[in-house]
Amino acid sequence: MTNQEYMLRAIQLAKKGEGWTNPNPMVGAVIVKDGKIIGEGYHKKYGELHAERNAIASLTESAEGAVIYVTLEPCCHHGKTPPCTEAIIEQKIRKVVIGSRDPNPKVAGKGVQMLREAGVTVVEDFMREECDQLNPVFFHYITTKTPYVVMKYAMTLDGKIATKTGASKWITGESARKEVQHMRHQYMGIMAGIGTVLADDPMLNVRVEGWKSPVRIVCDSKLRIPPGSQIVKSAEKYRTIVAYADQKNTEEKIKILHTMGVETIYCPDEKNQIDLKKLMADLGNRGIDSILLEGGGTLNDSALRAGIVKEVQAFVAPKLFGGVAGKTPVEGIGVELPSEAVELKYTDICQIGEDIRIKCQVCDKKQEESCLQES
């Protein structure tokens, strides 16, 4: 096997932790000696051993003089688990090949420095682009302390998320809907607007055995959510947060919601609407590193205008609804000129069953130049 193949194996291992490591990154590690793999591992779950220590625990022989390929710079601080740099040095591993750099201020090059001071050879930025693709959520959250927001919607080929009557079940096929279940498992939170709750009475949970359900977040400015809704009734089983902005006649309603296990966040803007930037800061402080936005056109528009959306995933079905009254993914007043559009960069297009999934990165002002260069 080549160096690239060993790192690809580490990437493959890292992906096994998807949905379980948050707010930690996904990391994989492979230990090689005399041209063969003698140990491998990945970070399985938040709070448990890191990839390097799991790889060491799986060793079939001494790692003295071996090379370890790891997708992210090894940690060098005591957290929920001991430092991985110490374990690497103790095992007398001679060389560490690293993919991504760790922007965590507790690490950020300190792990590399510690290894080199101990006489270990370190190679940085090996297949960095491929390794970086594992952890956009972690990189965003650790540097901003706000959730990485993915706007997801299903639409017809003519851009409708519902018919003129509001009917939307089902636009996409079974395979695409199962992928959405996987996405809910992957991200820590799922967010919808009160309009979706009142219209569909959704659970917003994961219905696949063995996958975890996200924290459910409802944007409800005037606190209209019914205590009898499925989301409220199941709040003691699935963590649920309702954000609101208007305190008028809400005291009794808040008491009821709290009694039923619902958390509330008051975050108004100057117009008594929810300040989404403040909400993201609050959710980040509560340890929520990522959000799947399953809103309607109004909430999607507000989220884009607030600048909180980092990625868009659109599932496109081979259907046409037609009609000017059909609902669209992003509503509001729209832009006046094409030059005012939200710029996106395609990152992946694939077929899932009968439908197409399109992934795009949102190009904010800081990213605009690189997006234009790479598009």
Task: Please name every model-derived segment.
Residues 3-17, 22-24, 63, 80, ...:
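Enzymes that bind and transform nitrogen-containing heteroaromatic metabolites
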Residues 8, 12-15, 39, 50-53, ...:
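A broad detector of short, well-ordered amphipathic alpha-helices
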Residues 10-14, 29, 34-41, 130-143, ...:
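A short, flexible N-terminal coil/short beta segment enriched in small residues
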Residues 19-21, 112, 126-154:
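Proteins enriched for Cys/Gly/acidic motifs involved in redox and nucleic-acid/cofactor modification
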Residues 25-27, 127-130, 295:
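Short, conserved alpha-helical segments within structured domains
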Residues 26-35, 153-154, 358:
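Short beta-strand scaffold segments in enzyme catalytic cores
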Residues 31-130, 215, 241, 246-248, ...:
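Zn2+-dependent cytidine deaminase-like catalytic core
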